[in-house]
A protein has these predicted regions:
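N-terminal helical cap/lid subdomain that shapes the substrate entry/recognition surface
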Residues: 1-114, 122-123
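Asp-based, Mg2+/Mn2+-dependent phosphohydrolase catalytic module
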Residues: 1-6, 38, 87-93, 108, ...
């Protein structure tokens, strides 16, 4: 089957944030809340999953919140602090964190990503992002100088549905003008990325640096798809 398009998850796939807990701890400390970065780091995925349970994937968590994305993230920060027995953060602390993670300096682009994306574009593939993110994502990708690699962005807060719901994948496919069987999705979550993509008829590859997936890094993708060793730097 001819491959015409590749779509990508964002967090833990295109981007990483190895200092996530420390960034939270630094901001909270400026607002009078002392908490260990390692405790925040451990709590964040638990809170993300907990808050996901309050909304069906057919209803994006950011749109689902009465006060939108900022309201969701304020709730997120408050719940994270509660989980680590820290004081309740102010609205100013939550706002500073919200603004910080819209900046390029808060993130790292995964090694090999830029070269890999350029390689796929040279081969004539259409590219898209499919991500459970809020409306800040397009600007963030611009600031990271990644946006120009992509033909379209399917973002849950704009589409109104989260992965693994079919609607977010179908939105990307429609924008790309590509049938599901001619598209591949790459992401780190078996449920959201692999099962979600396959559920609409796309191919899917699981990214796992630990080695229990299909790819250890995005730099391996061109060789996996085309059987060559072209440098993706």
């Amino acid at each position: 089957m001819k491959l015409e398009a590749v779509t990508f998850d964002v967090t833990h796939t295109l981007l990483s944030c190895p200092t996530l807990g420390q960034q939270y701890a630094d901001v909270l400390a400026r607002h009078g809340i002392e908490v260990a970065a390692r405790d925040i780091e451990a709590a964040i995925p638990l809170v993300w999953q907990e808050l996901a349970c309050s909304a069906s994937p057919a209803r994006d968590r950011f749109l689902h919140h009465a006060n939108g994305a900022r309201g969701f993230w304020r709730h997120f920060v408050e719940r994270t602090c509660e989980l680590v027995d820290a004081a309740r953060p102010s609205a100013f602390a939550a706002a500073e964190l919200f603004d910080r993670f819209a900046q390029a300096a808060a993130w790292e682009v995964a090694p090999g990503t830029r070269g890999m994306l350029a390689d796929l574009r040279r081969r004539g593939l259409r590219l898209a992002v499919i991500s459970n993110w809020d409306q800040r994502l397009p600007l963030l990708l611009e600031r990271l100088e990644l946006a120009d690699h992509f033909d379209t962005f399917a973002i849950s807060a704009i589409v109104g549905a989260e992965k693994p719901h079919p609607r977010i994948f179908e939105t990307a496919l429609a924008a790309l003008g590509v049938a599901a069987e001619h598209a591949l999705h790459v992401g780190y979550s078996r449920r959201d990325d692999v099962e979600g993509a396959r559920g609409v008829g796309m191919q899917a590859l699981l990214l796992s640096p630990a080695g229990d997936g299909d790819l250890r890094s995005l730099a391996e993708l061109p060789a996996r798809l085309f059987g060559d060793r072209q440098q993706t730097g």
